[in-house]
Amino acid sequence: MRKNVKQQLALRVLSTAALMAMVSSIATAAFADTYDLNKGSVTVETKEDGFTYVTQLDNTQTDGYARNDKDDILHDYQDKTGVTITSGGEKTSNTITVETAKDQTTDVTLQDVHIETESSWNNTGSAPIEIKGDGDTNLELNGDNTVLSGDSHHAAIEKADKNGHGTLTIKDDLNDDNSTPKDKDENGNAAGGDTGTLLAGGYGNGAGIGGGSSDLADTSNITIKGGKVTARGGCEDGAGIGGGTYGKAKKHPH
């Protein structure tokens, strides 16, 4: 009898181990807290399922759930805390793309990011930071951030109506260590000299924050809620904050 009990226990242990191995093999890796932009461009996408997927160097990670082909939840990953991207203050030409589906929200923290894309008048480049989709994107400012476009067709932080009518909110709700400040100043920023900064500069036809040129010129639904933000347009009449050359800035229903 004891032998049978031992055999049953052994089988249960083996079955549990096999199940855990299956979960490990099927599960998608949970995303890291912080991404180093020096290692490659980063794409952050919140899809209609409400899960956020982060891709860097063809490696995609998620904050959501791993599922099998029957859509059963296999493993619950970390709570959503948003994504932090940094270059440690070092200049890079790698870019950030944030895309948010309708009725969803993506939270991204810029921590000492310094992006300068290569100079181009042939519209062959890309925006340093591109905001896409019909959902809500929040950019939290930590440390000192510099975003400069080198392409005459693109804004530094580009949010073109062609790519969606969602919202972009730039804010400074948290301390630089992502803790909640005890006090805020009259502008709503973290008090005590912990204000995040942003310098966004367009090039040519692009805005500092907003539209690029041509079919990317129109923009909408941009809010600066906090932080110390300096935005300058390109030399061909791009706005500091607003549309690119000949573009319009407006509040668009989404």
Model-derived regions: residue spans:
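A composition-driven surface/loop motif
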Residues: 16, 27-254
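Bacterial Sec-dependent N-terminal signal peptides
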Residues: 1-19
